[in-house]
Amino acid sequence: MMKSQAALLGLTTLAILFFSGAHAAKITFTNKCSYTVWPGTLTGDQKPQLSLTGFELATGISRSVDAPSPWSGRFFGRTRCSTDASGKFTCATADCGSGQVSCNGNGAAPPATLVEITIASNGGQDFYDVSLVDGFNLPMSVAPQGGTGKCKASTCPADINKVCPAPLQVKGSDGSVIACKSACLAFNQPKYCCTPPNDKPETCPPPDYSKLFKTQCPQAYSYAYDDKSSTFTCSGRPAYLITFCP
């Protein structure tokens, strides 16, 4: 009798999971850069974080994490990371401030290239993009694996650090440009940040700095209202491949 009740409970649990739309979307990270990257993950809306919130990814290595559905969050790549004598872990770009390899619910300090994904329930329509709204630190792309609909890759393959204007440059200890600020971060003005009184698309056109980002990476979000050519969709429960230096 106990076995029958246990079996029934198991079937009931599976049915609840199935009909509630529970589904894990595999998200794979691949590093094609010539240097090590430390990916970070951040779940939105103060919901539970993924099982991996930060890890080391050497050149040529791939690693995966499962995201539930529905789910929404962002991914980033930290560079030039090290651990000091006290054991504190920090990165020169996109540091999440946790003091550890794991970000533990902390986001990337800008400037940072971001991949944003919103996973729908029940195989509905997912949304995803590469965003440079918080600036740029390394090339990234996101591509659905499987799924139905358009399901095109969104990519920013250019190294914007090489053409970053002087006012936006972030330099490393060796004097090289290691990241490129957004105009909003650099100047903190409403016309660049799309904040009042410039908080509508018609009052916040893309500045020249954003146009430079857009020229280098046409598929990426370059400023707050840049969504017509930069938001991508896919349905049918696809997996996702995020590539550093595609």
Swiss-Prot record:
One Pfam family per UniProt: Thaumatin
Q: Which GO terms describe its biological process?
A: defense response
Where located?
Secreted
**Stimuli inducing this protein:** Up-regulated in a tissue-independent manner following treatment with propylene and wounding due to embryoctomy.
The disulfide bonds in this chain are: C33-C245, C81-C91, C96-C103, C151-C234, C156-C217, C164-C180, C184-C193, C194-C204
User: A cellular component term (GO) from this record?
Assistant: extracellular region
Under the heading SUPFAM superfamilies, the entry gives:
Osmotin, thaumatin-like protein
What family does the entry list?
Belongs to the thaumatin family.
This chain's function reads: May be involved in protecting plant tissues from pathogen infection.
Protein's name in the database: Thaumatin-like protein 1
Q: Which organism is it from?
A: Prunus persica (Peach)
Q: What is the lineage of its organism?
A: Eukaryota, Viridiplantae, Streptophyta, Embryophyta, Tracheophyta
